[in-house]
C-alpha cells in the first residue's frame, strides 16, 4: 500500500518538445519511454455480493485495475525508440502496433506479470493543495489459467480497457513525472480497435509515493517537493488538482 501525492495537468502537442527539454533539465535525467495495457474490472452484477462488512457497516463496491507493460519492441516493430516517438502519435491507431495480436498473446500467456490495483477516492477537503490517494497494489506473476479466468474467479467482469504510452522522468528527490497519451481499446466480437482519447494533447502527472500513510515526515517532504515543482514549472505547465470524482473507482460512479 502507498499513499500517493499527485498533481496533474495537460499540454497541447506543440508544447511537448519544450516540456521534455525542461523536465530533462529539472530532473537531471533523460526521459524514459513507457507503455502500459490496462484492464478495468467491476464486480460481477450477476453475483449476490454482501454490501456490509462484519461490523454491519456499508461497504461500497469498487473497480479494480490490472496493468502490464507493453514491450517497446511491439510498438516499433523491433526498432529502437526514444521520446521522439511520441511526436508521431496523433491518430486512433498506432501504425506499427498490432493491438489485436498483442491482446491475443497476453490473454493466452499465463506467465505475464500483472499489477493488481485497488485505489480509494482521493481525500476530500477544500483547502488541499495536492491530491492524496491510497493505492493498494500486488503483483501477479503467474496464474493457473488466463488472467481473464483468474479475475472471473474473483467475481469480477470486464468494464473497459485502455493503453497509455508516454515518457517518464525520475527526479533524484523521488518525484516521478509522466507525460502520456491514452487510447481506449474496444473489443467487439473478434475485432479490436483503438480510439485516441487525448487528441491534440498530452496528460501530465507528477507524483510522490509514501509507503505508510502514518509517515508524516515523508508526506510533508513529498508535499514540499511537489509544490516546489509546481512553482518551478508555472511558466510552462500549470500543475493542479483535478476533481476527485474523476478518480473515483466506486461502482456507482460513472455507471
UniProtKB/Swiss-Prot annotation:
Subcellular locations according to the entry: Nucleus
Subunit and interaction comment: Component of the Mediator complex.
Positions of transmembrane segments: none
GO BP: regulation of transcription by RNA polymerase II; termination of RNA polymerase II transcription
Known role: Component of the Mediator complex, a coactivator involved in the regulated transcription of nearly all RNA polymerase II-dependent genes. Mediator functions as a bridge to convey information from gene-specific regulatory proteins to the basal RNA polymerase II transcription machinery. Mediator is recruited to promoters by direct interactions with regulatory proteins and serves as a scaffold for the assembly of a functional preinitiation complex with RNA polymerase II and the general transcription factors.
One Pfam family hit: Med18
Keywords: Activator, Nucleus, Transcription, Transcription regulation
Family, per entry: Belongs to the Mediator complex subunit 18 family.
Gene from which the chain derives: SRB5
InterPro entries: Mediator_Med18 (IPR019095)
Name under which the protein is recorded: Mediator of RNA polymerase II transcription subunit 18
Main location: nucleus
A GO MF label: transcription coregulator activity
Record-level GO cellular component terms: core mediator complex; mediator complex
